[in-house]
Amino acid sequence: MEQAQYNSLFSFIWNIATDVLVYAFDKSEYKKIILPMMVLRRIDVLLEPTKKQVISMKENLDKNHIDNQAPILYNVTGYPFYNTSKFTMKTLQSEIDAQRLKMNFIEYLNGYSRDVLDIVEKLHLRQVIDNLTETERLGSIIEKFTSDHINLSNKPVLDDEGNEKLPALDNHTMGTVFEELLRRFNEENNVTEAGEHFTPRDYVKLLADLAVQPIADQLQDTTYRIYDGACGTGGILTIAQERIKELGAKRGKNITISIYGQEQAPDTYATCKADLMISGEIHSFQYNEGGLQREYIAYGSTLSQDGHAGETYDFCISNPPFGTPWKEDLKKRGLKETEKAKFTDSRFTILDKDENEISFLPDISDCQMMFLANNISRMQDDTPLGTRIVEVH
């Protein structure tokens, strides 16, 4: 996609807020509507070609009383998501009655697979449906995102002569648009915690280079595992993935990457998951480890609710929050601030040569050291390159 086309697409989506939501919603609420609707429309157009097959397969599975339907429906769509409702966003916009549109939209949302629903819930889209309906903005939002003036599909829009009218939107560009919208919304509303969510791309490339460049000539044709225990919107994971593959390709290596992360802020977690979903960086959000079903991007506090317990990685790259007390993690373990010594977790203790236990637990105000200890616990000693850790402090 050319820069002018990118700018036009970005401006169209950005202006939906000022065209439709202005006066009806506070500016701080814009991203809670625009971002999930953009994700839904992207997914919606990807699923359109297999819509009839999915509904037919769903009916057949129900008829034969098959409970575990998700893997079969994923196979039909070719994506790690599906929608079993009778609606698409295009067909939704034909309803002119506000209340019926609301009910149809809810049915449409409920038809999505678990990971899309997870994103919808964490981004709090359902909480604004009533307001969108009462202000008669729901239909307008849907109309804007299904407009013929934009194309969120991965295939170009052609005119009657077969000429390209609108370019295809590839996964990478889709992810870039999403991240840029998120950044702009936060800047417009002076989001003070944005530093917790974003690590500039140049910084991330530097982090990746620090991790990989010293051993770049030793990279092999294999799969490497990257972990970020404070992954925010996932920027470090995706950019580090790109950089490692790029450095490998320059040396004639065919490298694949598996990414693992954890985030506790619901909107940031959902943003990470949505970005990975629409950018095509991940083909399944669940994996099996030791007979346990786990999430590649886990939800919850890394410090007290380890979503990747016992696992080790090739690269641990992160920019954890700073100046944030970890006393809430004590509370989650049923402990008071004065009971820090009772916070038991094998990640935060080591044995010295005399088998004496040494605690890594820092002061309550220093969660960065906790994240560093967590990364150290992920180190592996059964591979030629071991584990490379790069963490911002």
Label every model-predicted segment:
Residues 1-215, 284-288, 292, 299-302:
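Non-catalytic, mostly N-terminal accessory regions of nucleic-acid modification and defense proteins
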Residues 4, 198, 324, 359-367:
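Short, surface-exposed alpha-helical recognition segments that flank or form part
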Residues 4, 8, 12, 38, ...:
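Generic recognition of stable, solvent-exposed alpha-helical segments in well-folded globular domains
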Residues 18-21, 160-164, 188-194, 224-226, ...:
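Glycine- and acidic
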Residues 29-42, 207, 353-393:
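Conserved Class I SAM-dependent methyltransferase catalytic core
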Residues 47, 244-248, 379:
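Active-site catalytic pocket residues across diverse enzymes, especially alpha/beta-hydrolases
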Residues 196-318, 323-328, 332-336, 393:
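Conserved S-adenosyl-L-methionine
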Residues 327-358:
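A mobile, often basic/glycine-rich helix-loop segment
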